């Protein structure tokens, strides 16, 4: 029965692919827009209570606050207070306690109202926010969530170590309790934005005698603390996109602990799954998804004599893969009503990395030698290869 079902789905999908690849880009995009408008019109006839609540909160916010003229941090603060930061968070934590997919309504309406796009330097908000909301106590959530969302306090991730990359639970950074504080010693590496961050998501070993998954504790580390040293990691290109962080007798208040002592593994899993969510869904990373637009631009700029059917077919295959990925992300988001993403986003991250890798290779082949003078094509292709785990 299962084999027959899979064959039927494959057959239906192949028919869809064959149909789409015979269409022009304009026809495809027009069809997509028409479907979106149809679904929107159908949805407007019967709005559920949670959707109505979000729209009412947006109406109230936009009546008294104009995002196109206000200071961005001030507007985001008002947005947090209205429960429109992360709508699936609890009331008082920047949310309304509704299902997470309603965040899309908030983002769409605020964009239409002239709100500024999210600053890429606040990317780790998408990781730290859900972790603190899920595992932090009331005082931790009250202290960190609002300034994190407004962008007044930027965050970084302090997970990987020279001897603990894929084997994250094998980390060696130690935290020893001293009254109401913890003394931290160790090194972290590959830390994006650590040089501009105010706080770091820090996972340490607090019980070396316990099994390695059990003796870990999660902290919010003040990156300005005495004993914290951030060093840039210079790449062969001359750039320094990553850092390494050294901690020598750094004192961390117990009030900055996220979750119970020894429960750092559970808290870190929330961070890691939201990282997959952010990357897999195409959010937070400035160029994520831009490869598809690049491929279209390269195609449109090509001489007509070079636009053979095989190349057009390959380009349309990329479009289908990107659209399937987008719809898969939407479905995964709808299923994650608890606000904790599942393994689907790990798969999506790999799928998007493979897709972008193929798109960059496609552009390189179309451009030939001209691709060598473009940073994005020559460097992003191997970068996506690394991101996909190869």
Predicted segments, located by residue:
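Low-complexity, intrinsically disordered or signal/transmembrane-proximal segments
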Residues: 7-9
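Amphipathic, small/basic residue-rich leader segments at the start of a protein or domain
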Residues: 20-123, 133, 140-150, 304, ...
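A short, Trp-centered hydrophobic/proline-enriched beta-strand micro-motif
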Residues: 151-159, 203
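A structural signal for short hydrophobic beta-strand segments in well-ordered beta-sheet cores
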Residues: 173-176
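A short core secondary-structure module
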Residues: 185-231
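Glycine-rich beta->alpha junctions and the first turn(s) of the following alpha-helix
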Residues: 228-327
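C-terminal helix-coil-helix/basic helical segment that borders enzyme active sites and/or dimer interfaces
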Residues: 323-386
């Amino acid at each position: 029965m299962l084999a027959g079902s899979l064959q039927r789905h494959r057959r239906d999908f192949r028919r869809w692919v064959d149909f789409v690849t015979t269409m022009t880009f304009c026809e495809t995009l027009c069809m997509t827009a028409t479907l979106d408008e149809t679904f929107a019109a159908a949805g407007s006839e019967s709005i559920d209570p949670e959707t109505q609540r979000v729209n009412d909160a947006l109406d109230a916010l936009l009546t008294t606050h104009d995002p196109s003229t206000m200071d961005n941090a001030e507007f985001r603060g008002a947005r947090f207070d209205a429960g429109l930061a992360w709508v699936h968070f609890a009331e008082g934590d920047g949310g309304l306690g509704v299902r997470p997919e309603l965040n899309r309504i908030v983002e769409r309406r605020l964009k239409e109202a002239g709100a500024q796009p999210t600053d890429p330097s606040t990317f780790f908000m998408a990781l730290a926010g859900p972790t603190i909301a899920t595992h932090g106590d009331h005082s931790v959530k009250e202290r960190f969530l609002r300034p994190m969302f407004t962008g007044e306090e930027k965050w970084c991730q302090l997970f990987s170590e020279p001897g603990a990359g894929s084997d994250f639970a094998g980390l060696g950074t130690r935290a020893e309790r001293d009254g109401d504080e913890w003394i931290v010693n160790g090194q972290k590496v590959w830390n994006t934005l650590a040089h501009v961050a105010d706080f770091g998501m820090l996972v340490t070993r607090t019980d070396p005698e316990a099994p390695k998954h059990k003796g870990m504790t999660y902290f919010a580390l003040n990156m300005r603390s005495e004993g914290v040293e951030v060093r840039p990691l210079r790449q062969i290109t001359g750039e320094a996109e990553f850092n390494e962080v050294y901690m020598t007798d750094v004192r961390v208040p117990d009030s900055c602990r996220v979750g119970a002592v020894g429960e750092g593994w559970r808290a870190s899993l929330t961070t890691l799954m939201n990282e997959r969510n952010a990357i897999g869904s195409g959010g937070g990373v400035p160029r994520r998804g831009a490869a598809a637009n690049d491929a279209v631009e390269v195609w449109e700029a090509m001489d007509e004599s070079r636009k053979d059917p095989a190349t057009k077919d390959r380009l349309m295959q990329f479009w289908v893969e990107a659209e399937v990925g987008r719809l898969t992300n939407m479905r995964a988001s709808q299923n994650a009503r608890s606000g904790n993403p599942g393994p689907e986003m790990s798969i999506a991250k790999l799928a998007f990395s493979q897709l972008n890798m193929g798109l960059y290779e496609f552009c390189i082949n179309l451009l030939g030698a001209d691709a060598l003078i473009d940073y994005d094509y020559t460097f992003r292709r191997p970068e996506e290869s690394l991101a996909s785990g190869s």
